[in-house]
UniProtKB/Swiss-Prot annotation:
Belongs to the bacterial ribosomal protein bL34 family. One of its GO terms (biological process) is translation. Signal peptide: none annotated. InterPro entries: Ribosomal_bL34, Ribosomal_bL34_CS. One of its GO terms (molecular function) is structural constituent of ribosome. This is Large ribosomal subunit protein bL34. GO terms for cellular component: ribonucleoprotein complex; ribosome. Coiled coil: none annotated. Keywords: Ribonucleoprotein, Ribosomal protein.
Length: 51
């Protein structure tokens, strides 16, 4: 049986990346909540960055 998680960086960024979050009102709310909480990584696209 094929496993459910078939990783793809492109799909991951398109669905959960920063630009995808900024597109919708709900996504912007997620970002603002994560900023308020003080998250180092706001979205999956931040994982590439050096801190």
């Amino acid at each position: 049986m094929k496993r459910t998680y078939q990783p793809s960086r492109v799909k991951r960024n398109r669905k959960f990346g920063f630009r995808a979050r900024m597109k919708t009102k709900g996504g912007r709310l997620i970002l603002s909540r994560r900023r308020a909480k003080g998250r180092m990584k706001l979205t999956v696209s931040d994982e590439k960055k050096k801190y």
